[in-house]
């Protein structure tokens, strides 16, 4: 078959497919990508937005946040909810753990009057509610807190001590098969918060694993491993908050395995001012001499906490530093892309 005949045959096949399944059921990848640019929601931590490579968590995809207890999983998810609301979006929170604190959510910046919340009795109900909300096309982000608390109905109806092998994993696998396509069509971001467990009898390698089987690992576009790495000490004997480290364990949209560090303060959540200060020092925008921090010819203050408070008060300086950090990050991305192009050109053609 020559080229014109092949082209006619392909056009006939495409016309038949569109007649059978509807317009837009098949198209070139170029047209598809032009109409499906990835929209994101900021996480509240600039260092994490940059580590994710796309400026936040993607809409239309599944995101998993996992880690040990008291590591900041719910705080991070609530910040994403608050940022989605600030963009004019609608957020829903499926609280399977029955542990969401409205006061803390409000303190972080979430509008609790507009935040939809569901506390379902079983895992099947929780996942069905998530799918129906996504199918509506009116919700921007859905948080499921947590996978470990999604108890299958048959387990609830049984007695404590009964063995239910693989029930939760089967439930998750079945639900995610339906949910993935619905999320992509409605451009809804689904955030699954997950806990970690330890495998028994693992002598070599990492014994840690997450609950709910393997399906969530496969269907997630981004997986974030969040850990507490230290305490932020106050002037007295009490702690101000925790220092957090996030590793991007999986990323389908940018290079994975990047890490980000930021502060979670007990009275305000993620410290955006602390993030800006750390990144400004890292990129040599702000100079650190001993305990003093200098920006251009100006002394910002002595001690990290004092400068962080100054950035919280001075919105103009905060925005200026943030813009410079974004400019440097964008420039480094362009350089990396150009270097890759040159490298590919230099390779001999087989």
From Swiss-Prot:
InterPro entries: AAA+_ATPase, DNA_recomb/repair_RecA, DNA_recomb/repair_RecA_CS, P-loop_NTPase, RecA-like_C, RecA-like_N, RecA_ATP-bd, RecA_C_sf. Keywords: ATP-binding, Cytoplasm, DNA damage, DNA recombination, DNA repair, DNA-binding, Nucleotide-binding, SOS response. SMART domains: AAA (SM00382). It comes from the Bacteria. ATP binds at residues 67-74. One of its GO terms (cellular component) is cytosol. One of its GO terms (biological process) is DNA repair. The keyword Nucleotide-binding applies. CDD domains: RecA. GO terms for molecular function: ATP binding; ATP hydrolysis activity; ATP-dependent DNA damage sensor activity; damaged DNA binding; single-stranded DNA binding. It is found in: Cytoplasm. The keyword Nuclease does not apply. Belongs to the RecA family. NCBIfam families: tigrfam_recA. Can catalyze the hydrolysis of ATP in the presence of single-stranded DNA, the ATP-dependent uptake of single-stranded DNA by duplex DNA, and the ATP-dependent hybridization of homologous single-stranded DNAs. It interacts with LexA causing its activation and leading to its autocatalytic cleavage. This is Protein RecA.
């Amino acid at each position: 078959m020559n080229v014109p005949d092949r082209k006619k045959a392909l056009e006939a096949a495409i016309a038949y497919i569109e007649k059978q399944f509807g317009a837009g059921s098949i198209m070139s990848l170029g047209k598809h990508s032009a109409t499906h640019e990835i929209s994101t929601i900021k996480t509240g931590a600039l260092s994490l937005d940059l580590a994710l490579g796309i400026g936040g968590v993607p809409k239309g995809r599944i995101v998993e946040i996992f880690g040990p207890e008291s590591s900041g999983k719910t705080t991070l998810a609530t910040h994403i909810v608050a940022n989605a609301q600030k963009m004019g979006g609608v957020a829903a929170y499926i609280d399977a753990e029955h542990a969401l604190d409205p006061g803390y959510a409000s303190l972080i910046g979430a509008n609790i009057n507009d935040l939809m919340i569901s506390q379902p009795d079983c895992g099947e109900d929780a996942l069905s509610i998530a799918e129906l909300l996504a199918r509506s096309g009116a919700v921007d982000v859905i948080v499921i807190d947590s996978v470990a608390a999604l108890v299958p109905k048959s387990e609830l109806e049984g007695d404590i001590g009964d063995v239910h092998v693989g029930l939760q994993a089967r439930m998750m696998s079945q639900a995610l098969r339906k949910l993935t396509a619905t999320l992509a069509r409605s451009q809804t971001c689904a955030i699954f918060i997950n806990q970690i467990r330890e495998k028994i009898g693992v002598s070599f390698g990492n014994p840690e694993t997450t609950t709910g089987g393997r399906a969530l690992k496969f269907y997630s576009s981004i997986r974030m491993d969040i850990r507490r790495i230290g305490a932020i000490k106050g002037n007295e004997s009490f702690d101000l908050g925790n220092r957090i480290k996030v590793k991007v364990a999986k990323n389908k949209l940018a290079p994975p395995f990047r890490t980000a560090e930021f502060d979670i303060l007990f009275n305000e959540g993620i410290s955006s001012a602390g993030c800006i200060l750390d990144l400004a020092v890292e990129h040599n925008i702000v100079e650190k001499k001993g305990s003093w921090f200098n920006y251009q010819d100006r002394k910002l203050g002595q001690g990290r906490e004092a400068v962080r408070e100054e950035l919280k008060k001075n919105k103009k300086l905060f925005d200026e530093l943030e813009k410079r950090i974004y400019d440097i990050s964008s420039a480094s991305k362009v350089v990396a892309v150009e270097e890759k192009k040159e490298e590919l050109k230099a390779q001999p053609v087989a």
